Amino acid sequence: MVQKTSMSRGPYPPSQEIPMEVFDPSPQGKYSKRKGRFKRSDGSTSSDTTSNSFVRQGSAESYTSRPSDSDVSLEEDREALRKEAERQALAQLEKAKTKPVAFAVRTNVGYNPSPGDEVPVEGVAITFEPKDFLHIKEKYNNDWWIGRLVKEGCEVGFIPSPVKLDSLRLLQEQKLRQSRLSSSKSGDNSSSSLGDVVTGTRRPTPPASGNEMTNLAFELEPLDLEEDEAELGEQSGSAKTSVSSVTTPPPHGTRIPFFKKTEHVPPYDVVPSMRPIILVGPSLKGYEVTDMMQKALFDFLKHLFDGRISITRVTADISLAKRSVLNNPSKHIIIERSNTRSSLAEVQSEIERIFELARTLQLVALDADTINHPAQLSKTSLAPIIVYIKITSPKVLQRLIKSRGKSQSKHLNVQIAASEKLAQCPPEMFDIILDENQLEDACEHLAEYLEAYWKATHPPSSTPPNPLLNRTMATAALAASPAPVSNLQVQVLTSLRRNLSFWGGLETSQRGGGAVPQQQEHAM
């Protein structure tokens, strides 16, 4: 009876009538229940869990490889919207080519577009460096403008607005801070190696005497992020490609930044659409030698760019038109109480007049009575083209001043001192330095620069030209003198030759006596 019952329990073979698991003290465990749950009728259990995992893995793959119809349609709608927005942006970009310049800016930062900048049309963003000039045609949206780099051969494109540049800068600073912290954690924990990671290559590693906390606190404060981003981009290759789209100019010289007062510099400064031309040198304005040479150059410019240039005299002290003064009402009282020749209202009026003249996209030359040094205008919004008339030899300048008579000779020391101050300026402070001995060379140098600037500000694609410029040129053509132009050219070149060629022929005039150069100069 017992044997029959055991035989009826299942199809076990004679050698395995009773499984050994029955005598296992842990048949009620969790694993045993799972295993029994997938046991087949033939008793095979080796592939139970494998087959189950295979089925579940296959179902997951089939789920991910088959997106729903709603997801597909949503992706198609997004792509269609993107293409339509890009088409409209291209159409607006094409229309902007013939639009007049709304305003101009000078850049304080550099920009190199990257794929993550969300440019309205990929590949049409404009790359620029610090101190470049941009002509803005119109505002596309809150993040992008339409304009062009003032350089020959550059076409219109998308320019990031100040809001966009600030957001890119903040994102860049955040990534740089994270990169610094991660690099400091991955490095050695010793004080010397920590100093190397925090300070980088620009500052030496501080000694292990307690300065580590100072450098660490300095690292956490974003004092030098804008100045160090170029070097940090080179040190971390992966960070350079992703966050190096906005750059600031490197600092001039070595500075200790611990006590530096942080001041946010705007990415752009609004400047005249055409940079005004200002002559300085060879000495002080108001004295005969300087006024004589500058007047000869103004006459030359008036003839060469007839119909394309406006020459105007400025008597107000435009060096007072600093951005920090005009934007700060508390400083107005200080300026008004000082013994200045011009009031701030008069200065502001002159600045507005210069901006208005530049809107016509004509060349603008300023005969400024009070400007004798480029530093006087460095903090203004004029961004002028500084032309330096340079007399290399102080002896030549002395001879010129003495030849003008006693009224000029008694101010010899003042004029020589002003000339020396100009000579001490680095060449970067001037746009053009006219130090040629021959008249033709000096005039050709000046003409080449201004012609190149004219082409940079008037690209061939900007047709029709500015209507204000058309009216001005038409008026100038109607009012032109019927006298032959060649006579005027001969007069201007002759007057310049009498002055500029005198510098090179000073030794000959000294051997022949001092009356010859004086007679030539009075012929001016």
From Swiss-Prot:
Residues 54-71, 235-247 have a biased composition (Polar residues). Residues 1-77, 179-214, 228-259 are annotated as: Disordered. It is a peripheral membrane protein. GO terms for biological process: calcium ion transmembrane transport; positive regulation of muscle contraction. The N-terminus is blocked. Residues 43-53, 179-193 have a biased composition (Low complexity). The modification Phosphoserine is found at residues 44, 47, 73, 186, 193. The keyword Endoplasmic reticulum does not apply. Residues 100-169 form the SH3 domain. Its main location: membrane. The keyword Calcium applies. One of its GO terms (molecular function) is voltage-gated calcium channel activity. Belongs to the calcium channel beta subunit family. Regulatory subunit of L-type calcium channels. Regulates the activity of L-type calcium channels that contain CACNA1A as pore-forming subunit. Regulates the activity of L-type calcium channels that contain CACNA1C as pore-forming subunit and increases the presence of the channel complex at the cell membrane. Required for functional expression L-type calcium channels that contain CACNA1D as pore-forming subunit. Regulates the activity of L-type calcium channels that contain CACNA1B as pore-forming subunit. This is Voltage-dependent L-type calcium channel subunit beta-1. It comes from Oryctolagus cuniculus (Rabbit).
